[in-house]
C-alpha cells in the first residue's frame, strides 16, 4: 500500500495498525512475565513491579516516540525506509573510507534482522498458544506441535500472497489493541496505585535499589520494544503521518494500559506471574482471548516474513545477495512478493528453533541482542544523515547521538548476558548472513574487474567494426552488458569464434539506481553509437523488478522497434576457477562459487524467453 493511493487517512492509519505494529503489539504476551519471573534474583515485589513498568513506559516514549517516529523517520529515500536505505543515505556525502564503514554498519544491521526474524514468529505464536496452560493445563504438551502447525499453515499460504487475508489484518489488530486497553484498564481501576510508576523516578529508584541486577534485567525490558525497526522499514507502504498517528492514538495508549494493568494484577496477586497477560481476563473470556492472541501473533509473524522478503529483494537489487526467484503475488501492489528459497529456509529455521527451545521463556533469552545492536547502528547512521545530508549543527547532532547511545548501549550490553543462554542464535545467523552478503559483493566486484581489466575501448571497437565489417546476418542481436562503456564478453567471443554480426546490435544495460522507484519518463535511455549499434540503458529502483519486454516496449515508443520473438539475446556465462589465494580468501572464494552455482540465471531474472537466449561460456580465474 502506498500513500499515493487515494485512500482516506483513517483507512491508511488502520492499515498501518494491521501491519506495522504487529510485533511490538504482541510483546505484552511475554514481556512483564520475563521481567518478574525470578531469573534476576527478585520476585514480584512492589518496587520491582513499579521499576519495570516505569522502564517499559519510558522506553516506549524515548525509543519509539522520540527516536524512531520523530527523528529516524525523517531520513527517507523517496519515502522509503529501512536499515539499508539509511546506509545508502548516510554514505552519499561522505569520503570513500567513511562510506565503506557506513556500508559495513548497514550490512551488519541488515544481517541482525535476518538473525532476529527467526525468533519473532516462534516466540510470538508460542506465547499465544501457551494460553492453553491457563485454559487446560493438561494440554501443555501440545504447545510445540500446535505452534508448528500454525506456522506451517502460515508459511504455506505465502505463495498465494496475502492480499485477501491482509484485508483482515487491520480490523483484527485494531480489535487486539482495544482488548489490550480494555483488559488493562479493568485491572488499573481495581488497583490505581500502579499509575505511580509513570513517574520516571521509579526507574531511577529501581537501578539504585537493585544495582547490578537491575542492569542485567534491561535484557528483559527490551522485549517491550522488539519490532521497533518495522516502523521505519514499512514507512514506504503507509507514509510517516499515518504510522505516527496510529502510534499516538491507538498503539501507545493500549500498550501502556495493558502493561500497567498486568502490574496492577501482580501487585494484588503475585502468583499471576505464571502468565499475567491471560490472567487479566475473566475465566469466560480466556478461550476467545486465546483465539484473538493467536491471530495477532500470526499477523505479527506475517509482517516479519514480508519484511524479510522486502529486505532480500533490496539486497539482491543492490548487489549484496545473489539473484534469486522473486514472484509477485499481486498485480496491484509491487511490494507484495514471495521468495520461495527465503520462505522455506526461514520456515525450517523457525521449526528448529521451536523444537529446540520448547517454551517462549527460553526463546526470550535469545531475543534482544540483534534488536539492540541494530538500534545502536541506526543511531549512528541516522545522525550521520542529519549532519551530512541535512547539514544540522555538528554539536547539536553530537548531543542527539550521545542521548541515543546512552540508552542503546546499556540495552545492548545488558543483552550480551544472554549470549550463552540463547543470544548466540541470532548472532550466529546474522554473522552467516553478513559473510554471505560481503562475499557476494566483494567477489562479484573482483570478477567484473578481472573480466574487464584487459578490455578495449567500446567506441574504438565499434569504429573498427564499421570500418571493416564482418559478415552480417539478418536480424537484431541484444548483448547484455553489466557496464555502459565496456565491451560485452559475449560480443567479443561471438566475433572471435563465429566471425559474424547481426545487422542491428543493441548493447543493453540494466541499472539499479539508489532509489526505490524510477519514473517511467527516465526508465529507458537510447543512444545510437553508429549506423548499426545502439546503446540502451534501462534504470530501475531497488523495489522494482527489471523486465526486458517492458524495456523493448519503451524502446518502440522511442523509435527503436524490437520484437522479443525475433531477437537473439547473447549472454556470457562465466566458468569460474580459483586462483592462488591465502586460505581465508580461498574459503570465501569457494563460498562465492557455491552462491554463483545456485544463483538465478539472467534469462530468468529478466524474463527473457529461453528459446531466444544464446549463452557463450568463458573461463575466468578469480
Swiss-Prot record:
Major place of residence: membrane
Gene Ontology CC: one annotated term: plasma membrane
Topology class, membrane: Multi-pass membrane protein
InterPro entries: K+_transporter (IPR003855), K_trans_C (IPR053952), K_trans_N (IPR053951), Kup (IPR023051)
Pfam families registered for this protein in UniProt: K_trans, K_trans_C
Tree of life domain: Bacteria
Transmembrane segments annotated in the record for this chain: 9-29, 49-69, 103-123, 137-157, 165-185, 213-233, 247-267, 276-296, 337-357, 363-383, 396-416, 419-439
Cysteine pairings via disulfide bonds: none
Function: Responsible for the low-affinity transport of potassium into the cell. Likely operates as a K(+):H(+) symporter.
Family: Belongs to the HAK/KUP transporter (TC 2.A.72) family.
Protein name: Low affinity potassium transport system protein Kup
Source organism of the structure: Shigella sonnei (strain Ss046)
Organism lineage string: Bacteria, Pseudomonadati, Pseudomonadota, Gammaproteobacteria, Enterobacterales
Gene that specifies this protein: kup
